[in-house]
């Protein structure tokens, strides 16, 4: 007769073997989760079993549903949570490859405080609220379009979409990357009615906030805000086409200044970043009439530069290419005794300086009035630069000499032209409006020598 200990040992070995086999092949695993006041919606007739607990003793309870309804079971309930773990290494690799090719949607749980959401039409919300380390679902019926706010800790799902794996032919296409940036006092302008959802944070806890915008307006969210920022990734260098190309690019960089001053000739909206104690946040300024805008303190404002890069292949174009760059550059100018004529009522904001200290000064002018300020004034000086570029090349095979790009940057009143001189052929560059240059008399001298030789 077999001993009981051997039977127990055999059962244990079989149990361990079966559990390891299940884990290896990635079967579905069901885990028990204890909740309070279990709530679920049954869309059709069904029968399910849950475990209810009283005084640390749990027993199964069968619930029969004959029609579509919402079931609420009070007390402590143990309900199943189903998860599918990954299988073996080869199965994981194949699944990962297929998900990269086709893309997938991953849903995770995020705990937030004071959950807020907007329901545009009648519906029923089911969320999970937590208190004293115990979580239970809460059902909220919504009859009309409204904004629902649930106070306290709430567990809400967050969905993330993974993009499909790009093939080699699609690797050169641009990719849009969205990242999260934490700012203080978030400001944005909404030209059309819309709904904004941002995450506001307090004491290291963040929760979403929905803002309804019905008319064109500027929205300011005080405090710490997590907002998305979008950037475009350029294609890889290896996938660039080899045919002749001309690239026109505009590069915008941030320049840090103190007491930023600019003149707006027409109604517009200016967005700059003001900084205080190593923290920067965007500031939106609405300009309704032609005026001078002064932003005191440390300001990061955009600075734009334009570049043209022309590459030549084995067969250059028959006719030269003519390109024109035009840019408006605004620089501060210091004047003593500022005078200007205001044909219409307006408000002028100037920066006056005294004893090496400058501060904004506001002057209100009526229509048809000449305003004079006998002091040292810092005013913006705007000028337009226009550079016309002609690029032509001789017929030189690309295999003998790689093409050297010609870069022209129009960022100041004196156009700066920088060229790299190749050893074989130098592209001919002419700039309209530039000073006259001396022509190298090599060709004329050779012609003169030939004439003298023919005479003597």
UniProtKB/Swiss-Prot annotation:
<dbReference type="GO" id="GO:0005576">
    <property type="term" value="C:extracellular region"/>
</dbReference>
<keyword id="KW-0134">Cell wall</keyword>
<keyword id="KW-0732">Signal</keyword>
<keyword id="KW-0961">Cell wall biogenesis/degradation</keyword>
<keyword id="KW-0449">Lipoprotein</keyword>
<keyword id="KW-0964">Secreted</keyword>
<dbReference type="GO" id="GO:0098552">
    <property type="term" value="C:side of membrane"/>
</dbReference>
<keyword id="KW-0336">GPI-anchor</keyword>
<keyword id="KW-0325">Glycoprotein</keyword>
<dbReference type="GO" id="GO:0009277">
    <property type="term" value="C:fungal-type cell wall"/>
</dbReference>
<feature type="signal peptide">
    <location>
        <begin position="1"/>
        <end position="23"/>
    </location>
</feature>
<keyword id="KW-0472">Membrane</keyword>
<protein>
    <recommendedName>
        <fullName>GPI-anchored protein 13</fullName>
    </recommendedName>
</protein>
<dbReference type="GO" id="GO:0030447">
    <property type="term" value="P:filamentous growth"/>
</dbReference>
<comment type="function">
    <text>Cell wall protein which contributes to cell wall synthesis and is important for acquiring normal surface properties. Required for virulence in a mouse infection model.</text>
</comment>
<dbReference type="GO" id="GO:0031505">
    <property type="term" value="P:fungal-type cell wall organization"/>
</dbReference>
<keyword id="KW-0843">Virulence</keyword>
<dbReference type="GO" id="GO:0044182">
    <property type="term" value="P:filamentous growth of a population of unicellular organisms"/>
</dbReference>
<feature type="glycosylation site" description="N-linked (GlcNAc...) asparagine">
    <location>
        <position position="27"/>
    </location>
</feature>
<feature type="propeptide" description="Removed in mature form">
    <location>
        <begin position="434"/>
        <end position="456"/>
    </location>
</feature>
<feature type="lipid moiety-binding region" description="GPI-anchor amidated glycine">
    <location>
        <position position="433"/>
    </location>
</feature>
<dbReference type="GO" id="GO:0060257">
    <property type="term" value="P:negative regulation of flocculation"/>
</dbReference>
């Amino acid at each position: 007769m077999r001993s009981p200990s051997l039977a127990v040992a055999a059962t244990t070995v079989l149990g361990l073997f079966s559990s390891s086999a299940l884990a290896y092949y990635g079967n579905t695993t069901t885990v028990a989760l204890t909740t309070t006041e279990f709530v679920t919606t049954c869309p059709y007739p069904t029968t399910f079993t849950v475990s209810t607990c009283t005084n640390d003793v749990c027993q199964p309870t069968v619930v029969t549903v004959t029609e579509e309804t919402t079931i609420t079971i009070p007390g402590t309930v143990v309900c199943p949570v189903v998860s599918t773990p990954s299988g073996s290494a080869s199965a994981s690799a194949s699944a990962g490859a297929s998900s990269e090719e086709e893309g997938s949607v991953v849903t995770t749980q995020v705990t937030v405080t004071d959950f807020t959401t907007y329901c545009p039409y009648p519906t029923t919300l089911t969320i999970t609220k937590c208190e004293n380390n115990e979580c239970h679902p809460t059902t909220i019926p919504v009859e009309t379009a409204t904004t629902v706010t649930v106070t306290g800790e709430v567990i809400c799902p967050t969905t993330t979409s993974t993009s499909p794996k790009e093939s080699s032919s699609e690797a050169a296409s641009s990719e849009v990357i969205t990242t999260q940036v934490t700012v203080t006092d978030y400001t944005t302008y909404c030209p059309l009615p819309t709904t904004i959802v941002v995450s506001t944070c307090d004491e290291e806890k963040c929760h979403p906030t929905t803002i309804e915008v019905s008319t064109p307006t500027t929205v300011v969210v005080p405090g710490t805000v997590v907002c998305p920022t979008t950037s475009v990734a350029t294609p890889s260098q290896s996938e660039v086409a080899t045919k002749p190309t001309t690239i026109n690019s505009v590069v915008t960089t941030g320049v840090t200044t103190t007491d930023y001053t600019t003149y707006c000739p027409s109604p517009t909206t200016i967005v700059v970043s003001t900084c205080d104690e190593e923290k920067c946040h965007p500031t939106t300024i609405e300009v309704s009439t032609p005026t001078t805008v002064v932003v005191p303190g440390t300001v990061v404002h955009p600075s734009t530069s334009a570049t043209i890069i022309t590459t030549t292949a084995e067969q250059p174009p028959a006719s030269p290419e003519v390109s024109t760059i035009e840019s408006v550059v605004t620089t501060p100018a210091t004047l003593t005794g500022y005078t200007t004529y205001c044909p219409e009522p307006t408000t002028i904001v100037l920066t006056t300086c005294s004893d090496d200290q400058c501060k904004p000064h506001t002057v209100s002018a009526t229509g048809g009035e000449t305003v004079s300020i006998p002091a040292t004034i810092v005013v913006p000086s705007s000028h337009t630069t226009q550079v016309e570029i002609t690029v032509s090349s001789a017929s030189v095979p690309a295999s003998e000499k790689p093409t050297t790009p010609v870069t022209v940057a129009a960022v100041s009143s004196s156009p700066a032209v920088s060229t790299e001189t190749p050893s074989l052929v130098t592209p001919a560059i002419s700039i309209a409006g530039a000073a006259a240059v001396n022509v190298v008399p090599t060709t004329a001298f050779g012609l003169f020598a030939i004439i003298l030789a023919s005479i003597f």
